[in-house]
């Protein structure tokens, strides 16, 4: 089981790496069109995340930064540990019910 999980993780990392390397990370900033206001503004990728000009329409999420990789790994670890814990919990309750609740 452990080897199959490690194989799946290796394939996921390989696919993710090929996706990141195929993305054009050296692209120039483009004008962003707001559909409601129909206004354009120049997107500055170095603008601060906490500035007032940064909102959901102008902030570009990048999956090739260290913090995004770390966050995705944390989400994966939490999901796997939750599944393992819930499987253990449900299995022990099922066995406990079978053994001690027979009447």
UniProtKB/Swiss-Prot annotation:
- Signal peptide positions (record): 1-25
Q: Which UniProt keywords apply?
A: Disulfide bond, Host Golgi apparatus, Host membrane, Membrane, Signal, Transmembrane, Transmembrane helix, Viral envelope protein, Virion
Which ranges does the record mark as transmembrane?
69-89
Segments on the Virion surface face: 26-68
* Protein's cellular compartments: Virion membrane; Host membrane; Host Golgi apparatus, Host trans-Golgi network
Please give the Pfam families that the UniProt record associates with this protein. Answer: Herpes_UL73 (PF03554)
Q: What is its main location?
A: virion
Superkingdom of the organism of origin? Viruses
Task: State the membrane topology.
Answer: Single-pass type I membrane protein
Q: Name one GO cellular component term.
A: membrane
Q: Which residues lie on this side of the membrane: Intravirion?
A: 90-103
HAMAP family for this protein: HSV_GN (MF_04037)
State the similarity comment: Belongs to the herpesviridae glycoprotein N family.
Q: Subunit notes for this chain? A: Interacts (via N-terminus) with gM (via N-terminus). The gM-gN heterodimer forms the gCII complex.
Q: What is the purpose of this protein?
A: Envelope glycoprotein necessary for proper maturation of gM and modulation of its membrane fusion activity. Also plays a critical role in virion morphogenesis.
**What protein is this chain from?**
Envelope glycoprotein N
Give the species.
Answer: Alcelaphine herpesvirus 1 (strain C500) (AlHV-1)
């Amino acid at each position: 089981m452990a080897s199959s999980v490690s194989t799946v993780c290796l394939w996921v990392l390989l696919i993710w790496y090929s996706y990141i390397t195929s993305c054009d990370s050296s692209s120039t900033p483009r004008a962003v069109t707001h559909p409601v206001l129909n206004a354009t503004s120049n997107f500055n990728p170095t603008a601060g995340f906490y500035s007032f000009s940064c909102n959901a329409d102008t902030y570009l999420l990048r999956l090739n930064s260290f913090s995004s990789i770390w966050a995705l790994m944390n989400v994966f670890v939490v999901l796997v540990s939750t599944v393992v814990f819930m499987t253990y919990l449900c299995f022990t309750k099922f066995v406990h019910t079978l053994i001690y609740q027979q009447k």
